[in-house]
Each structure stands twice: as structure tokens, then as C-alpha cells.
Swiss-Prot record:
<dbReference type="GO" id="GO:0007507">
    <property type="term" value="P:heart development"/>
</dbReference>
<keyword id="KW-0963">Cytoplasm</keyword>
<comment type="similarity">
    <text>Belongs to the COX17 family.</text>
</comment>
<comment type="subunit">
    <text>Interacts with COA1. Interacts with the chaperone CHCHD4; this is important for correct folding and the formation of disulfide bonds that stabilize the structure.</text>
</comment>
<keyword id="KW-0479">Metal-binding</keyword>
<dbReference type="GO" id="GO:0016531">
    <property type="term" value="F:copper chaperone activity"/>
</dbReference>
<keyword id="KW-0007">Acetylation</keyword>
<feature type="disulfide bond">
    <location>
        <begin position="36"/>
        <end position="45"/>
    </location>
</feature>
<dbReference type="GO" id="GO:0005739">
    <property type="term" value="C:mitochondrion"/>
</dbReference>
<dbReference type="InterPro" id="IPR009069">
    <property type="entry name" value="Cys_alpha_HP_mot_SF"/>
</dbReference>
<keyword id="KW-0496">Mitochondrion</keyword>
<protein>
    <recommendedName>
        <fullName>Cytochrome c oxidase copper chaperone</fullName>
    </recommendedName>
</protein>
<keyword id="KW-0143">Chaperone</keyword>
<feature type="disulfide bond">
    <location>
        <begin position="26"/>
        <end position="55"/>
    </location>
</feature>
<feature type="short sequence motif" description="Cx9C motif 2">
    <location>
        <begin position="45"/>
        <end position="55"/>
    </location>
</feature>
<dbReference type="GO" id="GO:0005758">
    <property type="term" value="C:mitochondrial intermembrane space"/>
</dbReference>
<keyword id="KW-0186">Copper</keyword>
Amino acid sequence: MPGLAAASPAPPEAQEKKPLKPCCACPETKKARDACIIEKGEEHCGHLIEAHKECMRALGFKI
């Protein structure tokens, strides 16, 4: 049937590109932030927490 071709799913390349999840964004700042919080406590890591928030915002996350 000729009408079915138009209803077929997108090519595999388009399906593989999924939106970035917050857990996977900014791994460098996330790792530094988490290590600081574990070692020193959250109250001593404000600069790393803010750096991670800025990175997330730059990627379009609303934090």
C-alpha cells in the first residue's frame, strides 16, 4: 500500500538522538561537586555547587 511509507517511523539515526538527561549532564562539575560534599560537607562547597548549576543552565536545564 503506497500510503504506509509516509507513516513509517523516523530513521534509526533520529531515534537514537535522545534528549540529554540531567543525571548525565556536566559530569566534570558534578564529580567535583559530589566529592567536595562527601569530603567537606555541603556548606563548604557552594562554589562547586554554583558552577554545576551554571553548567546545567548553559545546557538548557531550568535550575
